[in-house]
């Protein structure tokens, strides 16, 4: 995909990311509009985290920095996993106590007695969105400096030759991967927002907290 074509497509993705940022900001309202619990604060902070990831993702897509964009995608998947962890943990009070004391969430257990490791949360979250596993593994490969980095910098030449880009303008070959990264980020932001919406819609506690009080 040419850079010109990429620019045309990425502008639409960026517009969608900005819409999700507003949705994440609006999602804070029912959790923090008045008295709030640790449960509310945990979910509200997840919104803040997602907004900052969007703030980072947009310039990375604009500058065509696939390595950094993929790491931000991995972080967005992590935000979904940690949000979901609150709903599947065996002991909510212990979970929140551990989180707010900067403890290890992965040492706690879910309702089936299994530790809340990233691998376990990835598996559980795949029940909501089956694309999670593949996206997580791809993004993690770039986070942890694996062969995925070589793929991102390689340029196919003639007669089975391969060139490598060291510090120059990013290859056009990564443009399609960047677009996919943007689309997936939107997908997982929507997943995060859906989880929050289910909480708000299922609990009467939030009925009169959806609009900011004057």
PLM feature segments, named:
Residues 1-67, 71-73, 78-86, 92-214:
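A cross-kingdom marker of C-terminal helix-rich interaction/assembly modules
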């Amino acid at each position: 995909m040419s850079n010109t074509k990429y620019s045309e497509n990425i502008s639409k993705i960026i517009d969608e990311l900005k819409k999700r940022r507003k949705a994440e900001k609006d999602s804070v309202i029912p959790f923090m509009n008045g008295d709030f619990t640790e449960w509310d604060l945990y979910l509200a902070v997840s919104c803040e985290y997602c907004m900052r990831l969007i703030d980072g993702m947009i310039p990375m897509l604009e500058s065509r920095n696939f390595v950094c964009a993929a790491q931000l995608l991995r972080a967005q998947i992590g935000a979904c996993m940690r949000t979901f962890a609150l709903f599947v943990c065996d002991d909510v009070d212990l979970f929140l106590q551990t989180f707010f004391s900067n403890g290890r969430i992965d040492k706690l257990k879910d309702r089936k007695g299994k530790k809340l490791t990233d691998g376990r949360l990835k598996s559980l979250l795949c029940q909501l969105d089956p694309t999670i596993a593949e996206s997580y593994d791809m993004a993690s490969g770039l986070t942890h400096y694996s062969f995925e980095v070589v793929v991102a910098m390689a340029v196919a030449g003639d007669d089975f030759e391969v060139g490598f880009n060291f510090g120059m303008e990013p290859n056009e070959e990564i443009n399609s991967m960047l677009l996919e990264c943007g689309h997936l980020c939107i997908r997982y932001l929507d997943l995060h927002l859906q989880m929050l919406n289910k909480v708000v819609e299922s609990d009467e506690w939030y009925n009169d907290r959806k609009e900011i009080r004057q």
